[in-house]
């Protein structure tokens, strides 16, 4: 997102394996290391890293926060909604919130990020829309991703209301010679029959196999997904399924 100060060193996103390696290098090699953001050319003052702020309270955000706690960081998780794990009912989310707080994650809910700035000592400050300031030595953005459909649009493929590529049961797009699978597509919800975006590894794996079957001449088809999701945190698990 185009937030003020987002290109400061020490601010990372979590989307690719290189992103994860950059975070590890920043932590392990010390602060005299560029964050990898492409619009900033400075260095942060050399100092121990003990404070982390994670932006986003879904899968990646919570799992990242847990790993930072295990690395000895004081972790604050900032989420613009009034709960973590939005698919959960609020009373269930409260159980998760209480559990992770007992294990060292400080939650700042119902408060969006307004921007970032660098303090005089070289550390970072996360500014929120409520006016609060969260000091940090590393900031990790775990805000989720949108389907990358630029190529599909250029090819004239049908794009759904949720922003994904529309496919049929055999993973064919609106052009029958072009197949699409994975996080960039819209699929039918197994329960409601409505179009949905399901960014999960299990369905993506199955879709790839079905597309390969169809290309090879087999009559395989994707029957939809229930979006079953499970997250493990500090030895416990939370899960949900259905519409």
Predicted feature locations:
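Glycine-rich flavin
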Residues: 1, 19, 188, 219-225
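Glycine-rich dinucleotide-binding loop and its adjacent helix/turn
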Residues: 1-71, 106, 167
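FAD-site-proximal beta/loop scaffold in flavoenzymes
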Residues: 7-39, 122-127, 132-214
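Short beta-strands and strand-loop turn motifs
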Residues: 49, 55, 77-80, 224-227
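A Rossmann-like FAD-binding core segment of flavoenzymes
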Residues: 69-169
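Active-site-proximal substrate-binding core of FAD-dependent oxidoreductases
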Residues: 194-199, 213-243
């Amino acid at each position: 997102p185009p937030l003020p100060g987002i290109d400061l060193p020490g601010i990372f996103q979590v989307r690719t394996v290189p992103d994860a390696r950059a975070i590890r290098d920043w932590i392990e090699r010390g602060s005299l290391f560029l964050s990898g953001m492409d619009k900033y050319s400075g260095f942060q003052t050399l100092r121990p890293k003990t404070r982390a702020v994670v932006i986003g309270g879904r899968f990646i955000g919570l799992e990242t926060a847990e790993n930072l706690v295990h690395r000895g960081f004081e972790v604050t998780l900032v989420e613009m909604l009034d709960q973590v794990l939005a698919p959960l009912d609020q009373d269930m989310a409260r159980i998760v919130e209480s559990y992770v707080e007992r294990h060292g994650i400080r939650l700042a809910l119902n408060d969006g990020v307004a921007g970032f700035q660098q303090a005089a000592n070289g550390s970072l400050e996360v500014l929120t829309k409520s006016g609060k300031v969260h000091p940090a030595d590393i900031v990790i953005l775990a805000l989720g991703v949108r389907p990358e459909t630029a190529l599909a649009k250029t090819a004239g493929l049908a794009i759904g209301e949720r922003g994904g590529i529309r496919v049929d049961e055999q993973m064919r797009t609106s052009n029958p010679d072009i197949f699409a699978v994975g996080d960039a597509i819209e699929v039918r919800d197994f329960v409601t029959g409505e179009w949905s975006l399901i960014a999960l590894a299990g369905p993506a794996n199955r879709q790839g196999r079905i597309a390969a079957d169809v290309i090879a001449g087999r009559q395989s088809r994707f029957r939809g997904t229930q979006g079953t999701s499970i997250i493990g945190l500090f030895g416990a698990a939370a899960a949900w399924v259905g519409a």
